[in-house]
């Protein structure tokens, strides 16, 4: 991939996702979208318990409509998270998938920094 979009609304931000539907329903994850185009995430409920991720895969973030962004990354585990963040109502919808599994996900989000 020669050029990967990383929308300014996402790049350099920490986004807290709270899942209301899907395999991680009830969990909250913080995603740090670094300026260098990588993302790391952790279980926000495990704060101070070493819950930080050890990997930083590249991500893409593209504005698809005013205040609406598609974000995706492929983790070393083989799972891809692809979500749409709607900054107008702070809702998130998307899919967590692997070569064998596919799960729709929904929730809410907040930008924490």
Question: What are the functions of these language-model segments?
Answer:
Residues 5, 70-113:
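Beta-sheet ligand-binding and adhesion/scaffold domains
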Residues 9-16, 36-40, 65-72, 92-93:
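Short, hydrophobic/aromatic-rich segments at coil-to-beta transitions
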Residues 47-85:
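Contiguous, well-ordered beta-strand patches that form the walls/edges
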Residues 25-59, 98:
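N-terminal glycine/threonine-rich, aromatic-flanked beta-hairpin/loop signature
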Residues 22-24, 38, 46-48, 66-68, ...:
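Generic "edge-of-domain/loop-turn" microfeature
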Residues 18-20, 34, 42, 74, ...:
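A structural detector for beta-sheet-dominated domains
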Residues 1-25:
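Tryptophan-anchored aromatic micro-motifs
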């Amino acid at each position: 991939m020669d050029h990967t979009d990383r929308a300014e609304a996402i790049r350099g931000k920490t986004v807290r996702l709270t899942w209301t539907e899907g395999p991680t329903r009830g969990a909250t994850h913080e995603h740090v979208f670094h300026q260098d185009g990588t993302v790391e995430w952790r279980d926000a409920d495990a704060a101070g318990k070493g819950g930080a991720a050890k990997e930083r895969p590249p991500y893409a973030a593209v504005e698809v409509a005013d205040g609406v962004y598609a974000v995706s990354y492929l983790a070393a585990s083989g799972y891809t998270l692809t979500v749409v963040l709607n900054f107008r109502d702070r809702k998130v919808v998307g899919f967590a998938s692997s070569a064998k599994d596919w799960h729709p996900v929904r929730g809410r989000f907040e930008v924490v920094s």
